[in-house]
Structures are given as C-alpha cells and as structure tokens.
C-alpha cells in the first residue's frame, strides 16, 4: 500500500534502457511486451492469491479484489488474446514469468497458489486461442515451426554479451558504469527485506536472472532455434529489477528499523547511488527528445509519392532484425520476405502461411547464385515481383542503426542479371527493378503457363508475348482487359476458385498455372473481367471471431463492474 514502493517500481521500470533500444531499432515486439508485461504480472499475482493480492503467504491488502476465477480468466484471457494478435511472443514472456514466480517462491520458501495460478493460466490461454482461432488455424497449424513464433532470426546481428545483459544494455561495447546500478537494485533488497517483501524480491531477482540467462543461452547456441532480440529478452529482466526495487523501498520503510545498528545501515546509501546511476542516463537522453530513434527511415529513401503504381510487389533480402516484414529463411542466416509496397508498415508483420511460390522463389535465387541464369527477373515475374531490395542497414546514413552485411556472392549474382536494373539508394540499401515484370494479371498469347510447372517455364528460352490487364479497384482484387483468341490469362496469386472470370459475360473455369498460380484459357477474343470473391467459410469464421470478441468484451466489462474489493 506504499506510494513510495509503487513510484520506485514504476520509475526503475521506465528508466530501463530496453524500451528506448526498442524505439531506436524499431522492435515492435519489444515495445509491445514492455507495455503489457507489468499488467500480466499483476494478473498472475492475483491468480496466485499471493500476499498482498490474497491471503497466501501473508496478509491481504485492503486494495485487493475479492477472488473470482471467472473474472480473472476473462481479464487475463482477453488481454492475452489482444496482445497475442500483435505479438505471439507474449505467450513466451508470460510462460517465462510464471516459471520465474514459481522458482522464486520455491527458493524463497514462500507459499504460492500454484494450482489456482495454473488453472487460470490454462483457461486464459484457451480463451486467447479461441479469440484468435481462425488466424491460429491458418498460420500456426498449417505448417508449424519455431520460426512461426521466433521468426527467422540469426545470431549474426546479436549485439549484446553477458555483461551487457546484466546492465540491461543491448549494444555491444556500450561499457557504461551507469548500467551496474540495475543488478545492485535487484540484489540489495535481499539483504533487508522480510516477509512477503522478501518473497517478492526473490521473485523479482528470478525474473531478472531469467532474462539475463536467456541472453547467455542464446549467445552460446545451445538451442535448436534463435531466441528473439536482446531488447525483447530483457523486458522480463527489467520488470524483475523494478519489482525487486519496489520491495527494497518497502524494506527501507519497514524492515531496516528491525535490525540492530550495523552494516545494513549503509544499504540505503548504496540504493541511492544505484538509483542515481540508472536514472542519470535517461535524463541525459531526454534532452534530444528522439530517444535514439534514427533521423532518417527506409521509407524516406525507398518510397516516393510519385510511385503510385499499385501493381507492385517487393522482395526484400536482409537480416531478420533489419526487415520490417516477416519472412522465410534464406541462405541459412538471412531472411527473404515479400510485401505489396516499398513503404514498410505495421501490417507487414502479419505474414501469410507458406505457399508453393516461396519454394519456387528460393529455387530461382539458388539458380542465380550458382550462375545458372542471367535473367532472374524473368523467373521472378510470374510471382508478380517488380522490385528486389537488399537491406544491410536499418536506417540510411548518416543515421545510426543496426548493420548486417549480406554475402558478397549474392550481390555479385544480382549484378550479373541482365533484366534487373540496379538503383543505389544509399550505402547498404540497394534496389533492383525487374525489367521482365508483367504485373499481377496478364494476358499471354498461346499456351505457355497453364498446366505447366515452374521449372519448365524457367528452362524455356522463348520470350512471352504479354500484355497487362487493368486493375479496376484500389484493393487489387479485380482486373479487366481485352484478350485475343486462344490466349491465356495469368494471375500472380495462389490458385483459388474464389477468383471468378467472365469472358463476354460467360463464366470460364480457372486452372493451375506454373504449379501454383491461377490461370484461364480463352478460346475466343473479347472483354475479360476477373474478380476475387471472398469465400463464405472465411466470412463465417471472421464473423464468429468478431462475435467471440464482442461476447468476451461484454463479459469482461460486466465482471469488472461488479468486482468488489476485500473487506478487512
């Protein structure tokens, strides 16, 4: 109930450099977890009924809510579902937090409502999964792998060592004495705290050490996958330091006076020095007002208002930490991703399930790397790819940012392609325009693509006679144009019978083209209109999901409105 404890915990949490490093590197996962994890810890503490949120292990605070499993499951499940839709890493963070609470309680020898905690956690996970079921079914169950959660990261871009993790500093070589205030604030309370403050201080230290240990394990390569970025892994550590610091303030208020005069009376001086060490760097950074965010962005140099062509699909190659969009693994340590614009947005974080086209694109690049073709643009054209962008810096010079060089053989192979025109945007940022691109919807003379495999097309030497159809909407779901007799219409979209085509008002049936795309064959000339119609199953699932969110929100609002605090 101490205002000093609440203030101290909040201040120490907000001065932790992990949030500002997430700002400077554009880590959405880091920012999302930094904002939501304290609330998750609060809900988990209530679920465990541990003092002061319940009677287990000590007295109950007069500000605590009465126990209600239904309300607690609704609250935690709703927040989990909401955050999970933006960052699946929240499940990893919450699970780690629960493990640290349990381990900390066992080390401290303090009671914790384990059974109630796990019951509420499992039910909350189930509720979060139900709220996101259509997306989970499509994205996770279709082809689940560790990359589904942790993306295609590599250790190439890691910029933190063990000592840096102890100081919550995520940049290699950032040897600042100020960061040593964080471990001091984490462990000093263990020398003073008593009772439930001792238990929560140990739990906070468990969170802190778990975050640091995750950095160390990831750096040593002991796991079969690469963990998230350092600023993400250190969010639980920052929260643990904040919890322990709050308990330290409480122990200075309540527990210090219970000890005889001795060395413990020097601990307040140590705590004050440690607090100054961690607060001063933030005050210094506040003068600039940008918190380390680069002055220039990739969007500033890649995208211009003059480029209004909607028939554009960009293939990005770089380290996963440098790319805004999620993607697939490429050349072991790098990532390849595809977006519909040169301007990176938050929406690019949602990557569709893997398609056969992904494998074909990888094969095309593999062929180019082995000097098997000098017309890579032709091989990428059936996938609608109009541009290839190589990213080696997270921000253009002179701004500072992450920098990961791409293999020289990749850059040399692209320079040998006759149908890729290089546009040097900035040092470390190169764009190649595909001169062989023929758009998302095209009319092709003769029988060239339908019922043929991509490898057959790639080995062909005859040029195609292609003319693009005109997009009739801003969403890229409808096209039209005049086509000749005995010609094909090719759509650079995965095959689906939801594409409806009419030639002179008569419906024609789709066929598979190049082993993945959608094609139509016309035996007569005339006006062709192609439109994508969303399937009823998809509409029903989305309607069900919206209904579930509405019911969950109404139930949560009603349960919170009727919640009562403990009467002491």
What is each of the regions a protein language model found here?
Residues 395-432:
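Short acidic, glycine/proline-enriched helix-loop-strand junctions
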Residues 1-291, 295, 300-303, 309, ...:
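Membrane-embedded transmembrane-helix bundle of lipid-linked glycan/lipid transferases
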Residues 451-568:
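Active-site-proximal, structured, solvent-exposed surfaces of multi-pass membrane proteins
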Residues 416-421, 435, 444-447, 467:
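Short glycine-aromatic motifs
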Residues 27, 98-101, 142-148, 328-336, ...:
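Short secondary-structure boundary/capping segments
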Residues 385-386, 430-437, 527-535:
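Short, hydrophobic/aromatic-enriched beta-strand segments in well-ordered soluble domains
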Residues 80, 277-281, 305-387, 391-397, ...:
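Extracytoplasmic/lumenal acceptor-recognition loop(s) of multi-pass membrane glycoenzymes
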Residues 77-79, 175, 201-204, 231-233, ...:
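Active-site lining segments that contact anionic ligands and/or coordinate catalytic metals
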């Amino acid at each position: 109930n101490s205002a000093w404890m609440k203030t101290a915990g909040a201040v120490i949490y907000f001065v932790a450099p992990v949030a500002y490093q997430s700002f400077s590197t554009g880590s959405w996962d880091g920012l999302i977890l930094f904002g939501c994890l304290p609330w998750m810890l609060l809900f988990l503490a209530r679920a465990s009924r541990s003092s002061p949120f319940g009677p287990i292990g000590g007295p109950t605070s007069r500000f605590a809510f009465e126990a209600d499993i239904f309300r607690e499951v609704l609250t935690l499940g709703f927040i989990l579902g909401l955050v999970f839709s933006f960052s699946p890493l929240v499940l990893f963070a919450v699970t780690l937090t629960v493990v640290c609470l349990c381990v900390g309680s066992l080390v401290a020898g303090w009671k914790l409502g384990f059974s109630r905690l796990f019951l509420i956690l499992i039910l909350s996970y189930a509720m979060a999964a139900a709220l996101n079921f259509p997306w989970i079914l499509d994205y996770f169950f279709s082809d689940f792998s560790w990359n589904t959660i942790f993306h295609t990261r590599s250790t190439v871009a890691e910029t933190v060592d063990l000592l840096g993790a102890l100081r919550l500093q995520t940049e290699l070589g950032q040897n600042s004495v100020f960061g040593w205030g964080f471990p001091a604030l984490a462990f000093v309370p263990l020398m003073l705290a008593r009772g439930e403050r001792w238990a929560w201080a140990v739990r906070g230290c468990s969170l802190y050490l778990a975050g640091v240990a995750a950095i160390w394990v990831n750096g040593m390569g002991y796991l079969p996958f690469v963990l998230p970025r350092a600023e993400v892994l250190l969010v639980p550590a920052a929260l643990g330091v904040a919890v322990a610091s709050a308990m330290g303030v409480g122990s200075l208020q309540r527990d210090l006076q219970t000890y005889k005069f001795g060395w413990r009376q020097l601990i307040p001086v140590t705590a004050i020095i440690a607090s100054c060490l961690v607060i001063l760097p933030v005050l210094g950074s506040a003068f600039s007002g940008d918190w380390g965010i680069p002055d220039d962005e990739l969007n500033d140099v890649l995208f211009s208002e003059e480029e209004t062509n909607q028939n554009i699909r960009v293939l990005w190659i770089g380290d996963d930490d440098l790319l805004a969009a999620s993607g697939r693994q490429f050349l072991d340590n790098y990532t390849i991703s595809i977006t519909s614009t040169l301007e990176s947005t938050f929406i690019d974080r949602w990557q569709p399930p893997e398609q056969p086209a992904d494998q074909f694109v990888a094969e095309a690049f593999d062929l180019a790397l082995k000097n098997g073709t000098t017309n890579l643009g032709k091989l990428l054209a059936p996938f609608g790819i109009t541009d290839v962008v190589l990213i080696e810096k997270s921000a253009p010079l002179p701004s500072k940012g992450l920098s990961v060089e791409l293999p020289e053989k990749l850059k040399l192979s692209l320079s040998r392609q006759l149908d890729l025109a290089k546009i040097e945007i900035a040092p470390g940022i190169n764009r190649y325009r595909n001169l062989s691109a023929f758009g998302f919807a095209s009319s092709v003379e003769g029988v060239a693509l339908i019922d043929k495999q991509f490898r057959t097309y790639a080995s062909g030497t005859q040029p195609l006679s292609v003319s693009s159809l005109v997009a009739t909407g801003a969403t890229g779901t409808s096209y039209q144009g005049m086509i000749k007799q005995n010609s094909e219409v090719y759509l650079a979209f995965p095959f689906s019978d939801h594409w409806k085509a009419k030639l002179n008002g008569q419906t024609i049936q789709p066929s598979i083209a190049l082993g993945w795309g959608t094609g139509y064959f016309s035996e007569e000339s005339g006006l062709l209109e192609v439109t994508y119609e969303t399937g009823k199953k998809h509409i029903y699932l989305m309607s069900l999901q919206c209904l579930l969110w509405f019911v969950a929100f109404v139930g949560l609002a009603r349960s919170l409105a009727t919640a009562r605090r403990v009467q002491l």
